[in-house]
Every structure is written in structure tokens, then in C-alpha cells.
């Protein structure tokens, strides 16, 4: 029975292991912007539900009680001994105990402290309680702990299995033995959190027989179902298998690697004889090695893309992989103090207040960059600058070196500006004057130094850019029509890369890219297929990327020869292509795709097995895929699909992104004790993997020449033993190098010996504690080496016992705290250099407590108000603060920016509540010594929540059965549902069914079902469901997947059937084509019906041409011109015929009129116009043969030919028209024609007529206006004398209008010739302002108007009369005392 229970428990644990992905307990830090990886110094933490330690099914020997520590000795004592003394939170406030540290004199009271629950940890400076309770601190830096064992995930460098084991041994560890499920789960969680999918990790296990894998300690590798992937492996071309120690010459794919029962999956082929010895060196004494065959008998953790999870995979021992080390020996409390020492700031032990003047070694803030000097610009700019910048105190000085090879050995030549006047060093700038490629091209680096040491920069390369000239002539290119064509640029020699442009016929008439034409980054001009318009002269232009220097190539012709055939769709040349060819992380990657073939193809980019990333987008009609700021996560296979109506093809390209070394664990400054040890660790992510070198004061530490008793170098780890200030105080650097770059990380080592000092971190003068709580007083003096501690209370020495404990860090904990613990406490720190002490007074206060709390449960409605209130009693010496929380989040006044939430000390008001306001509200009262809280559960009733899981169970042409799961009822029962839908034709959500009563189909899941009718056939539907209760309509659900209704025949007839027009013999029928959503199937076309009005039989025709849909032209007898026809239209699709439209009556096409207008007469209207009349035309069908639209008048000067005639179109059926724009005193011939929609009829006989002579060309002069009374004025002017080419004057017009109106509103007062040259203008409005002009007129028309415009204002009538001496009443004001004549030229003289 017990065995069965254990088996079931194991199975449950395995299930948990298989589903660990979503169970992380904390947010991950942002990944590295280039590598895409998590920071390598990030160490994940686990909560109780995540760690196997707290798994209730855990069956190991450890206690599952989360309050129990592992029984590991800490300074000779079990951690359980210390557990009771770490209760409480670091810092001054919050749940937890009193921790008194630098800058914090207040503690607190709280519940039992959980050492592995990160949520209970405070953040006041260095938390010594954290240090001694966080299990990871019992392991060295960059190691993680699990079950009293330390683990290190080595992320650089990659090594084969034997060297990986050797490195682990150097760390006093070994390759990990995975012998139980808990450890396996722990490893998987770390691999997931560290985002290492692209890497593989060696463990110790190897295969000893079919399905038998054994760890190095002879324990069995943990056996988990489906944990091995035997069919995935590293391809042979992977750089890991191309290590220079061996040469594998046959392809791995020739063997059967998929058989898990095969004993030793062998690597076929031979090993080069010169490398056999090296290869044998990798194989242990018990490894099988015969017939020069190697075996895949090692195990790695690798991410399976097929199964999307981490699995075991077999591997070759000679592969270069990452690896995992484990060590029980390293798990020690000594690491706590070591880590605390390693966190000493760089100003540790220095009594300097000005942070900017703290002595410090140099460190680079700007590295020199690669520079290209454009030799084509040397006449304008003939110098080049390389720059570096370092900080430090004293300010660093700089030296520059040139890196040269002498006898195949790299040497650094110091640049001396005093000896070579071409060089200048200013600050960190190296300026080279008149640079010459033969002398100056190469790599440079700078060295920054001050009295604390020297550091070197990264290398920067100085290159020389140039572009040679194109060849002067180029032969013609020839291509066949309708076939693809590529024209290569043939650029001149150049450095660095150039951009390509193509000109057509002349420069700068650049070729415009379109769906058919493409200019690639390879420089070529591509045509999907050639057309005759491509026949032209072309020229290629190049421009360097480092300046505006460019070159224009010669023009050459492209000849196009006819060809009736079309090229089938193919990929052009070697497309798809990637630029740059060897992409590096951080580059912008450009993937190009180009195809030849007719018709024009479309392009689509996809990523194999994954969607395109967010930083990727397509341009240039989909031909080009751009990946911005590429990372190693962008590695993979990308496929281009080309499609035209005749063919579809797909081709892939693999991107393998390299990466320059980037430090994930940089060096950090170290302040170490005299005669102690220091370990520098650096780690860089790089592709290919990085190799490491170490430097001291810019000089390389050669492992062959160092003192091996003191210096230990193991790849990226440097250890120095028995530190001495004179020998070891220096600047140290780690160099990570691959074929792309060498990166450096630097740090200062300061060896220190000093007596304890409390100057920077004294104990607080007063420490407030809470009665019966936990109190922690941190004693943190500066000292080297770490001091011993002694505590006194009121002058009496106290020991570590009872309710007081002294931690190895010097921290004093008191738990529980009583009134007897009040007093003066003294911490005494001493080492061999001296002694110092600091004092603190402990005051014990009464804890705070609630006297009023909110109700435990509140029920409210949406848009209502919530009011909460709490009150606490507290000691008068304490200051308290009220904090309100909602679901754990602290609320602030106007928290959401809408003014709804009002936080007023111990009162909380929430206005206009919504469903998001439901949840737990907490009133927290905080003081310096403890905090308390009270929770209230608030329920909000409102409209229902959004349903979920909407899907279609069954669908037909117009109906669908939909199922969903109800969302939250939000306190009220659901009454009914509304079902919304949208289609591929219309993306707007509309109600497709309302007031739906659903049927429950599964009472366990509350799944509902309903039928929707009146859907549109042949449509892709998405559905959404909203629930309705007494309080309103709820939130719509997320859209369902897309479902398509079945096809059906059209349901409606075409609309707006009509027609008419066209040429004689045509019957044109028009209609509105059905909308896409009305077509109900593919293959839509139409059938038209027609017949003479009154006839019985219908004629018909089907119209299938897509380009003229909506119009049909059928042939009828020619003599049926302008005849009424009855027509109708019917829609047809691939399923069947729709209904016929209603009958519409239209006319057939018209014929041209057959009669000419009779007796045309033209009479002169004025000097520039004729009035032409004629006898009305008989409007019979036989004469007009359609509908008369108007008349066309033809006129020309009698002195000109009729071919020079001008036409005037009169769009009316009246029998007269005015022809304007003629010349004065000129004879014209005039003809008239009738016209309809078919054209014009025959011309009438011509008629000759002369226009009048000109209108008067002189305006009247001496125009004056006089007021007669408030409504009458008198106007006088002088006579106008006409010239011989003018018609005699017939009279005059006085034109007057209100000044605020336009002249078109003017009234004309006519004065015939022969009368007195004056006019009285009556009926004017008193007080109004008027404008006035006078003109002469004749048969030739109106003459020019007087100028300027006269402006005057009428006077107002007065009621008060004044008697004259003659006894008559007169108006005091007839018009203003004088008429105001404004010489405003409102209008030009006519």
C-alpha cells in the first residue's frame, strides 16, 4: 500500500514538473537588448508554491514545513538555532521585527518571519538578517542553493565534457548528478528563468546500456516519462562540433540516431590522423573507443523546439556546451561574510565627504570606435580622430598604442607625439594628421592611468575608405519581353560598402521601384518581367556609407526583343538573400526576396515555427523584411512565398546571428582584507563563444609566468591568494574575445587593513521597540579584517542566550522584547588593528491596536458610493500613518486620475463604483515600531461579466448553433443574451440576435447554447455574446474563432435596373452589382432579359465578364432606334440563380437627327453679340430619332474659310440663341444644327449679318450729385461725343446702389438722348449711403462708366422746424452739409 502511495505521489510530482512554466513567483528583469537573455547575475527566487521544498507531495528527507530550515551548521550551529532571531522585517516599518541599521532607528512588530518568503523582506540598507536567512547567501556569489547544495549554471565559456568537469573541479565542485525529481525540477525552473533556449548544458550522466543512463557518482539518472528527446541534435555545421581539436569528416545524418535502444549512438566517419591523439585525450579510461568511432553517450539539458520544453538529449563528449556544477562543500555560512565584504563600496574605509574627490582608479566611460577615413575627402578634411574617455580621481592621463604584428607576434607600439609631429594626443583624443594607409591603417587602443593603476581600452580599427571610377563604357543589355531580367551594377573597387542607385536616361532620374521593378542591396536592378516601357538607357550610381562621396556609372541601353511567351514563376538568381551576409546582434537585418515571372507576383515572409517578431516589418511591396536591432532570439529559418495567379513557390533562408562579447557578469571593485583571498569572476555572452584573458595594470597575466601559489586563472575566474597591499593594489581587467571583438571589464582591487570605525555607521541614539515584539540592532562598523563583536547593556556584558542573540555579523536580536530590555546598549568591535564602540538607547513602547474597523463585508452596486473608516489607538510617542490598499495595491488620493477615489487619512471614499472596485480593501496603520491591518471584502453588483469560450457547434447557410460559458453574474441573475456578429465583409459589430434565451447544455461548466438565424451565406463570421441582467448589458465576450456559413444562391435581385444610350443598334442595360455579402458564393455573374414594350417573349443573355459587371450591351435591329424596351436582370452564382428584378422600361440607343433647322436669321444684338432665331423643328421620332438635347450654332467671319468656324452649343430646345464674343462691326456667316445623344443633324442654310459698331468708349465727365430732400438727389453730367467707329449715343444710364451691396443690385435710371443732361433719383432711403456711376449707351451696348465712383449719404428728416424770414418751414438737414465724394475706385472705368 505504501509503495502505491509513493508511486502516485511520484506521478503527481512529474505532472507538476511538466507544467512548471506559468508558476513563477516574481517578475523577470528585462532581457538584454542584444542577446535577448536575462542578466546572468540575476538569481531567481521561489515562493512556497514553486519550490520543491514546499511541495506537499515531496517525499524526500527534508521537512515540508515551510518554517523549518535545513539542518546545516552555521558557524557551528544549526540554522534552526538562528531562525527565531531573524523574525521581523529589515528597516523601519512594515511587518517584521525591529532592525536598527544605518539611517534607521526604528523597528517594528510583525508575524513570524518566513526566511524563504521574499515578500516579507524589507529594504533598509544592508540587511544582515536577510544575509543569514536567505539560503542563496550560503553559496558563493553567482551560485544558487537548493537542499543545502550550491549550483552554478556556467554560461561561459563553452567546453567539452571533460574540460567542463575539470572546471567544476577547479571550483571545488563537480558536474551535476541529476538523481531525483526535485533536483530535476529545480534545474528546469532555472533554465526557464534564465532564457537559455539556444544553449545546451552538460550534466555528469552517460549511457551505459540501452535505456540506461548513470551519473558520475554511479547513481541512476532520474527516470521521467517522455523526458528524453532522441531525434533532435546539434547539426554538424554547428560551431560546437568544429572545434580545432578534431575534424569530423562524415555527415551525422548517415547514422540512425533516432533509436533510443541503440547502445551508444555513434558518430560515423574518421578522425583526422593528426588529431587522433587529441581526440583520445578527451576520452576517459572507461570510454569505448574503437574503430575510430566516437559515441553520443553523454547527456545535456536542451530545449526541444518540437515539444516546446526542456528535455534530456544525448550528446557527444566532444561537443562544446555550457554546463552545470554542484557542490555540497561550498554551502557554508562563511560565504555570508564573504559576500558582505564583496559589497563594500569603493569609498569603504575612506574619511572623505566629497564623493567626487574620493580616490579611485580609472574606468572607461567611452571606448574608442572603429573609424573610416575617406581618402576622397582629404582635400577638405585631412585628419582623423580616435577618442576614449575615462573617469577616476586623480583625473587619468592617456597613452595611445598602435597594434602591429612583428614576426607573427602582436606588439603594442607607443605613439609619441613629441617624436612624430603627425600625431597629437589631447585628453583622450588621438589626432592623426595627413593619415596614410600604408602607415596608419590598423588597430589602436588607449591606456588610461592614475596613481592607482592602468587600464587599456578596447581596440579600434582605423580604415581607409575609397571608391574607384567606373569603366567608361559598358555594352548594351538585351532582354525578351515578358521574361524576368537582372542588370548587374559592376561597381568599381570600393571600401567600405556602398549604396546602389539606378538612373534612367539621365541623372538624377532615378528608377522608381514598384511591384515589378526592384533595386537590391546586391547592387542589381531586377525586373519581374520586361515590358516595352523598360526600353531605355540605364546607369548605376554608388555612394559610400561613410560620406557623401559617390560615382556615376556609364549609361548603356537595354534592348527589348518581342516574345509572345511568358516566363513561369521562379525565384530570381540566389534569392532570398540576407544583408549583411554575416549579421551581428544590434544590426538591422534586411531579408530580400525577388521573383521572375508573369503575371506580377506577390510576396509574403514567414518565420518557421514562430510568428514574425515585433521588431520586424515588411517594405517594398512585401519583398523586403526588415528586422530592427536584431538579437540572437531572431535566429531561425525565414521563408519567402511568391504567388501569382498561375503558381506558388516558397524558399527559405537561415539566419545565424553572431554577437560581440557582452558582459553579463562584469568585474566589480573589490576592497579586501590584508592576507585574505579575492576572486574576480567575469562572464560574457558571445557568439561564437568567448575566450578570456586577464590583465593587471594593462599588462596581460600570462598563466605560464605568474606565481601559481598566489594566482589561479581558470578561464573567466581569477583568484589571488594572500593579498598584500604593495603587490596587489592595482587595476584588473577581464578580456572576453571572439572573432568579432575583444571586450574588457575593469575593476580596482584595494587591500585594506584598518581598525573598526563607527564614524559612518554609528548605532542610532534611540531605538524604539514594541512590547512583546522583535527588535534587531545592527552593528555595522567599517573594519578590515572583519572584527569580533561584544555587546553590553547598561555597562554589563551580555551574551548570546535566552531571548537575546548575537549574530556573526554583530547584529543583536531581542525576541520577545520586554520592559526589562530598556537601557543603553553598546556594540564593541575589535580586530588586530584596534577597537571602537557605539551606543544606542532602547525604548520599549506599547503596540498600536484598532479601536474601530470597517465591516467585514460590503455589498454595493455599480455607480454607487463606498465609504470605509478605521481608527487605531497608539502610544503618544509614536507617529502613525494610515495606508489604504485595494487587493494589495496602495491607494493614493485620486488614484486613477478621475477623482473617484478620495483618501482622507483614516477614511476612504470611492465614488461611481465599477466592477473593478470589487475586492479586498485593507486599512493599514503603520508606526515606527509595528503595523496592523484590517481587511474588508467589497462586492459590486452590476451588469454581467463577459462570457467566455464562444464557439460555433454547428453552422449552415443561414443558421448557427453557438455555445459559450457565462462570465460573472455580478450579483444578479442573467435574464437573456444578445449575440453580436461581424463578417469578412463588414468589420463592424452588429446585433445578429437579441433577447436570446439560452439553453444550458453542461451544468458542471454552465455552458450555454443558442441558435442564431438570418445569417448571410458564404460569409466568415465572428461572434460575440453579451449577457443582460436587471442592472444592464454586460461586457461583450472576446470574439469567437472565425466560422464560415455555407454557400447558397443569391437572395435578392440586382437594384437600380435601367439603361439607355450607346451607339445605334445597341440596347444598354445597367444595374447595381450585388455587394460581396449579397453574392452568397463565388462565380457571381448576371443574366439580362429584354423585349420590346408590349411584346410577349423575352430575349436573354448571361454576362460573365468581371471587368464590365453592372453593364450589358445587346444588339437590336438598327431601325429600332430610340424605342422603348422592357428589361430585367437576374444574379447567378455557382450554386444557382437568384430572383429576377422588377421590369424597367428603357430606350434603345438614339440615331442622329435627320432634319435641319429652317430659315435661320441672325440679328445684331450689340457690338459683340448676335441674336439667332430659326423656325422650330418637328419633334417627331422620325425627324429627331431620339430626344432633342439642343442646337449647335456654327459661325465664322465672311472673310475667312468655313473650316475656321467656331461652334456654340445651346443646350435648350428653344428656337433662338445668343452668340457672344464677336468682334464689333464685322460680318459673320451663321448656320444652325439640331443634336441629340447620338450626335448632330444636318446644317441649315447660312445667314450673313454684321455686328454693331463699338459701344461708347468715353465715360461721362463732370458728374455731380445734389441733394433735393432726404429721399431725392439730382445728378448732372457732361455730354459724351462718340468717335467714327462707335455707334451713335442713344442715351444715358444713372446707375445707383447701396454702398454695402454689390453693383449687380444697382438700379438704372435711363435718360434718352435729346433730353437735358440731368436726372432726379427719387425714393432713396434717408440716412443710407449710396454709390453712383453714369454711363452712355448705344446699339453697340453700354459704354464705359464714370470714374471715380461717387459715394454719398442721404440726410435725416428733422421734426423741429426753423422759420425763415419768409415764414416757410424747411428741413434743417436735407443732405449732409456737403455731399461726401469719396474717390474710391471700386470699379474700373468702362
Swiss-Prot record:
| Alphabetized InterPro entries for the sequence | C-type_lectin-like (IPR001304), C-type_lectin-like/link_sf (IPR016186), CTDL_fold (IPR016187), FN3_dom (IPR003961), FN3_sf (IPR036116), Ig-like_dom (IPR007110), Ig-like_dom_sf (IPR036179), Ig-like_fold (IPR013783)
Q: Which GO terms describe its cellular component?
A: axon; plasma membrane; septate junction; side of membrane
Record-linked CDD domains: FN3, Ig
Q: Which UniProt keywords apply?
A: Cell adhesion, Cell junction, Cell membrane, Disulfide bond, Glycoprotein, GPI-anchor, Immunoglobulin domain, Lipoprotein, Membrane, Repeat, Signal
Coarse class of the protein's main subcellular location: membrane
Does the entry feature the keyword Acetylation, yes or no? no
List the Pfam families hit by this protein, alphabetically. fn3 (PF00041), I-set (PF07679), Ig_3 (PF13927), UL45 (PF05473)
The record's account of how the chain is modified after translation: N-glycosylated.
Propeptide segments, given as residue ranges:
1363-1390
Lipid-anchored residues (GPI-anchor amidated alanine): 1362
- GO molecular-function term, one example from the UniProt record: cell-cell adhesion mediator activity
Q: Which residues form the Ig-like C2-type domain?
A: 362-463, 468-561, 576-656, 661-745, 756-843, 848-939
Distribution of this protein across tissues and organs:
Expressed in ectodermally derived epithelial cells from stage 12. All these tissues, such as epidermis, hindgut, foregut, salivary glands and trachea, which contain pleated septate junctions. Expressed by ectodermally derived epithelial cells and along peripheral nerves. Not present in midline glial cells. Expressed in epithelial cells and glial cells of peripheral nerves.
Composition bias type Polar residues, residue spans? 58-67
- Where do glycans attach? 369, 537, 604, 629, 691, 774, 912, 986, 991, 1166, 1171, 1307
Region entry Disordered, spans? 25-67
Membrane topology of the entry: Lipid-anchor; GPI-anchor
Signal peptide annotation? 1-18
Q: For this entry, list what GO says about its biological process.
A: axon ensheathment; axon guidance; cell adhesion involved in heart morphogenesis; dendrite self-avoidance; establishment of glial blood-brain barrier; establishment or maintenance of epithelial cell apical/basal polarity; homophilic cell adhesion via plasma membrane adhesion molecules; nerve maturation
Q: From the Swiss-Prot or TrEMBL record, state where the protein is found.
A: Cell membrane; Cell junction, Septate junction
Q: Which PANTHER family match?
A: CONTACTIN (PTHR44170:SF6), PROTEIN SIDEKICK (PTHR44170)
Q: How is the quaternary structure described?
A: Forms a complex with Nrg and Nrx. Forms a complex composed of septa junction proteins Nrx-IV/Nrx, Tsf2/MTf, Cont and Nrg during late embryogenesis.
Q: What does the UniProt function comment say about this protein?
A: Required for organization of septate junctions and paracellular barrier functions. Septate junctions, which are the equivalent of vertebrates tight junctions, are characterized by regular arrays of transverse structures that span the intermembrane space and form a physical barrier to diffusion.
Question: Belongs to which family?
Answer: Belongs to the immunoglobulin superfamily. Contactin family.
From the Swiss-Prot or TrEMBL record, give the protein name: Contactin
Amino acid at each position: 500500500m505504501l509503495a502505491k502511495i509513493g508511486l502516485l505521489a511520484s506521478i503527481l510530482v512529474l505532472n507538476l514538473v511538466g507544467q512548471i512554466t506559468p508558476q513563477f513567483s516574481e517578475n523577470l528583469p528585462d532581457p538584454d537588448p542584444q542577446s535577448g537573455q536575462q542578466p546572468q547575475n540575476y538569481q531567481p527566487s521561489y515562493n512556497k508554491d514553486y519550490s520543491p521544498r514546499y511541495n506537499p507531495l515531496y517525499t524526500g528527507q527534508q521537512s515540508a514545513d515551510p518554517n523549518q530550515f535545513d539542518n546545516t551548521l552555521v558557524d557551528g550551529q544549526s540554522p534552526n538555532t538562528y531562525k527565531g532571531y531573524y523574525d521581523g522585517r529589515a528597516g523601519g516599518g512594515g511587518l517584521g521585527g525591529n532592525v536598527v541599521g544605518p539611517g534607521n532607528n526604528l523597528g517594528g512588530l510583525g508575524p513570524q518571519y518566513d526566511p524563504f518568503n521574499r515578500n516579507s523582506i524589507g529594504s533598509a540598507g544592508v540587511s544582515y538578517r536577510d544575509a543569514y536567512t536567505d539560503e542563496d547567501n550560503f553559496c558563493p556569489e553567482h551560485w544558487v542553493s537548493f537542499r543545502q547544495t550550491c549550483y552554478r549554471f556556467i554560461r561561459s565559456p563553452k567546453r567539452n565534457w571533460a574540460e567542463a568537469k575539470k572546471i567544476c573541479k577547479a571550483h571545488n565542485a563537480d558536474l551535476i548528478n541529476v538523481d531525483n525529481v526535485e533536483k530535476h525540477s529545480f534545474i528546469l525552473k532555472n533554465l526557464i528563468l534564465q532564457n537559455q533556449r539556444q544553449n545546451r548544458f552538460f550534466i555528469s550522466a552517460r549511457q551505459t546500456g540501452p535505456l540506461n543512463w548513470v551519473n558520475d557518482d554511479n547513481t541512476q539518472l532520474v527516470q521521467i516519462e517522455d523526458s528524453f528527446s532522441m531525434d533532435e541534435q546539434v547539426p554538424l555545421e554547428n560551431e560546437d562540433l568544429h572545434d580545432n581539436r578534431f575534424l569530423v569528416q562524415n555527415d551525422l545524418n548517415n547514422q540512425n540516431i533516432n533509436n533510443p535502444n541503440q547502445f551508444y549512438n555513434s558518430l560515423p566517419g574518421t578522425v583526422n590522423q593528426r588529431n587522433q591523439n587529441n581526440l583520445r585525450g578527451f576520452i576517459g579510461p572507461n570510454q569505448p573507443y574503437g574503430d575510430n568511432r566516437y559515441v553520443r553517450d553523454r547527456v545535456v539539458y536542451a530545449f526541444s523546439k518540437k515539444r516546446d520544453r526542456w528535455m534530456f538529449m544525448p550528446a557527444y563528449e566532444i561537443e562544446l556546451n555550457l554546463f552545470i556544477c554542484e557542490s555540497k562543500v561550498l554551502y557554508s555560512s562563511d560565504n555570508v561574510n564573504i559576500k558582505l565584504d564583496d559589497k563594500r563600496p569603493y569609498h569603504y574605509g575612506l574619511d572623505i565627504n566629497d564623493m567626487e574627490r574620493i580616490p579611485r582608479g580609472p574606468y572607461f566611460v567611452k571606448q574608442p570606435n572603429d573609424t573610416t577615413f575617406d581618402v576622397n575627402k582629404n582635400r577638405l578634411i585631412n585628419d582623423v580622430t580616435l577618442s576614449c574617455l575615462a573617469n577616476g580621481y586623480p583625473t587619468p592621463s592617456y597613452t595611445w598604442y598602435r597594434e602591429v604584428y612583428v614576426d607573427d607576434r602582436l606588439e603594442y607600439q607607443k605613439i609619441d607625439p613629441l617624436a612624430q609631429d603627425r600625431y597629437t594626443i589631447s585628453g583622450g583624443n588621438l589626432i592623426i594628421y595627413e593619415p596614410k594607409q600604408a602607415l596608419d591603417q590598423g588597430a589602436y587602443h588607449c591606456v588610461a592611468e592614475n596613481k592607482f593603476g592602468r587600464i587599456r581600452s578596447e581596440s579600434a580599427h582605423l580604415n581607409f575608405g575609397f571608391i574607384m571610377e567606373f569603366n567608361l563604357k559598358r555594352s548594351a543589355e538585351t532582354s525578351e519581353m515578358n521574361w524576368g531580367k537582372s542588370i548587374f551594377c559592376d561597381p568599381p573597387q570600393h571600401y567600405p560598402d556602398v549604396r546602389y542607385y539606378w538612373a534612367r536616361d539621365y541623372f538624377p532620374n532615378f528608377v522608381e521601384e514598384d511591384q515589378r521593378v526592384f533595386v537590391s542591396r546586391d547592387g542589381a536592378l531586377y525586373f519581374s518581367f520586361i515590358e516595352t516601357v523598360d526600353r531605355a538607357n540605364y546607369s548605376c550610381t554608388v555612394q559610400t556609407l561613410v560620406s557623401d562621396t559617390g560615382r556615376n556609372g556609364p549609361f548603356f541601353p537595354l534592348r527589348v526583343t518581342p516574345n509572345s511567351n511568358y516566363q513561369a514563376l521562379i525565384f530570381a538568381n540566389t534569392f532570398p538573400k540576407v544583408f549583411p551576409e554575416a549579421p551581428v546582434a544590434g544590426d538591422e537585418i534586411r531579408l530580400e526576396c525577388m521573383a521572375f515571372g508573369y503575371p506580377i507576383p506577390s510576396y509574403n515572409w514567414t518565420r518557421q515555427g514562430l510568428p514574425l517578431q515585433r521588431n520586424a516589418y515588411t517594405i517594398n511591396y512585401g519583398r523586403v523584411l526588415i528586422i530592427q536591432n536584431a538579437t540572437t532570439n531572431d535566429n531561425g529559418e525565414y521563408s519567402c512565398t511568391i504567388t501569382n495567379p498561375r503558381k506558388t513557390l516558397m524558399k527559405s533562408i537561415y539566419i545565424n546571428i553572431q554577437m560581440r562579447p557582452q558582459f553579463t557578469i562584469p568585474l566589480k571593485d573589490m576592497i579586501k582584507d590584508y592576507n585574505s583571498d579575492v576572486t574576480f569572476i567575469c562572464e560574457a555572452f558571445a557568439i561564437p563563444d568567448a575566450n578570456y584573458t586577464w590583465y593587471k595594470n594593462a599588462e596581460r597575466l600570462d598563466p605560464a609566468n605568474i606565481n601559481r601559489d598566489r594566482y589561479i586563472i581558470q578561464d573567466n575566474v581569477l583568484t589571488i591568494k594572500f593579498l598584500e597591499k604593495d603587490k596587489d593594489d592595482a587595476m584588473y581587467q577581464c578580456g572576453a574575445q571572439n572573432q568579432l571583438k575583444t571586450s574588457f571589464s575593469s575593476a580596482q582591487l584595494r587591500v585594506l587593513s584598518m581598525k573598526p570605525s563607527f564614524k559612518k555607521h554609528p548605532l542610532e541614539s534611540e531605538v524604539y521597540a514594541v512590547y512583546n515584539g522583535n527588535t534587531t540592532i545592527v552593528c555595522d562598523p567599517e573594519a578590515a579584517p572583519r572584527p569580533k563583536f561584544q555587546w553590553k547593556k547598561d555597562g554589563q556584558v551580555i551574551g548570546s542566550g535566552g531571548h537575546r542573540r548575537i549574530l556573526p555579523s554583530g547584529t543583536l536580536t531581542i525576541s520577545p522584547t520586554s520592559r526589562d530590555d530598556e537601557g543603553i546598549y553598546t556594540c564593541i568591535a575589535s580586530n588586530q588593528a584596534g577597537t571602537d564602540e557605539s551606543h544606542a538607547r532602547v525604548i520599549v513602547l506599547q503596540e498600536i491596536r484598532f479601536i474601530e474597523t470597517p465591516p467585514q463585508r460590503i455589498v454595493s452596486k455599480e455607480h454607487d458610493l463606498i465609504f470605509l473608516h478605521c481608527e487605531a489607538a497608539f502610544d503618544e510617542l509614536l507617529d502613525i500613518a494610515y495606508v489604504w490598499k485595494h487587493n494589495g495595491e496602495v491607494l493614493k488620493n485620486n488614484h486613477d486620475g478621475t477623482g473617484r477615489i478620495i483618501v482622507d487619512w483614516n477614511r476612504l471614499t470611492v465614488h461611481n463604483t465599477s466592477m473593478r472596485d470589487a475586492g479586498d480593501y485593507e486599512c493599514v496603520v503603520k508606526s515606527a515600531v509595528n503595523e496592523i491591518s484590517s481587511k474588508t471584502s467589497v462586492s459590486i453588483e452590476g451588469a454581467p461579466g463577459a462570457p467566455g469560450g464562444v464557439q460555433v457547434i454547428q453552422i449552415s447557410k443561414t443558421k448557427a448553433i453557438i455555445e459559450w460559458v457565462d462570465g460573472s453574474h455580478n450579483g444578479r441573475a442573467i435574464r437573456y443574451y444578445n449575440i453580436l456578429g461581424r463578417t469578412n465583409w463588414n468589420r463592424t459589430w452588429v446585433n445578429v440576435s437579441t433577447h436570446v434565451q439560452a439553453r444550458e447544455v453542461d451544468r458542471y461548466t454552465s455552458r450555454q447554447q443558442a441558435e442564431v438565424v438570418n445569417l448571410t451565406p458564404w460569409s466568415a463570421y465572428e461572434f460575440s455574446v453579451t449577457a443582460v441582467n436587471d442592472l444592464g448589458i454586460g461586457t461583450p465576450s472576446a470574439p469567437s474563432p472565425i466560422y464560415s456559413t455555407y454557400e447558397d444562391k443569391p437572395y435578392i435581385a440586382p437594384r437600380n435596373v435601367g439603361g439607355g444610350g450607346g451607339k445605334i443598334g445597341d440596347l444598354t442595360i445597367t444595374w447595381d452589382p450585388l455587394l460581396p455579402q449579397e453574392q452568397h458564393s463565388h462565380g457571381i455573374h448576371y443574366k439580362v432579359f429584354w423585349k420590346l414594350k408590349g411584346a410577349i417573349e423575352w430575349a436573354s443573355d448571361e454576362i460573365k465578364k468581371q471587368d464590365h459587371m453592372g453593364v450589358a450591351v445587346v444588339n437590336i435591329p438598327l431601325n429600332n432606334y430610340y424605342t422603348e424596351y422592357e428589361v430585367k436582370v437576374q444574379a447567378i452564382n455557382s450554386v444557382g440563380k437568384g430572383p429576377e428584378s422588377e421590369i424597367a422600361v428603357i430606350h434603345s440607343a438614339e440615331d442622329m437627327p435627320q432634319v435641319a433647322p429652317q430659315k435661320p436669321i441672325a440679328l445684331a444684338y450689340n457690338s459683340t453679340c448676335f441674336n439667332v432665331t430659326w423656325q422650330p423643328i418637328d419633334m417627331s421620332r422620325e425627324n429627331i430619332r431620339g430626344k432633342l438635347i439642343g442646337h449647335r450654332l456654327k459661325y465664322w467671319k465672311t472673310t475667312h474659310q468655313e473650316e475656321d468656324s467656331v461652334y456654340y452649343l445651346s443646350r435648350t430646345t428653344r428656337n433662338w440663341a445668343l452668340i457672344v464674343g464677336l468682334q464689333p462691326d464685322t460680318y459673320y456667316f451663321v448656320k444652325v444644327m439640331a443634336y441629340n445623344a447620338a450626335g448632330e443633324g444636318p446644317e441649315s442654310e447660312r445667314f450673313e449679318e454684321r455686328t454693331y459698331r463699338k459701344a461708347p468708349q468715353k465715360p461721362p465727365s463732370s458728374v455731380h450729385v445734389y441733394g433735393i430732400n432726404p429721399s431725392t438727389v439730382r445728378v448732372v453730367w457732361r455730354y459724351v461725343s462718340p468717335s467714327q467707329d462707335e455707334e451713335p449715343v442713344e442715351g444715358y444710364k444713372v446707375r445707383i446702389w447701396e454702398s454695402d451691396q454689390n453693383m449687380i443690385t444697382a438700379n438704372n435710371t435711363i435718360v434718352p438722348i435729346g433730353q437735358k443732361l440731368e436726372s432726379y433719383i427719387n425714393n432713396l432711403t434717408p440716412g443710407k449711403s449710396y454709390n453712383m456711376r453714369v454711363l452712355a449707351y448705344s446699339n453697340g451696348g453700354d459704354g464705359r462708366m464714370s470714374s471715380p465712383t461717387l459715394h454719398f449719404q442721404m440726410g435725416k428728416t428733422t421734426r423741429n422746424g426753423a422759420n425763415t424770414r419768409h415764414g416757410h418751414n424747411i428741413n434743417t438737414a436735407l443732405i449732409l452739409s456737403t455731399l461726401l465724394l469719396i474717390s474710391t475706385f471700386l470699379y474700373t472705368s468702362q
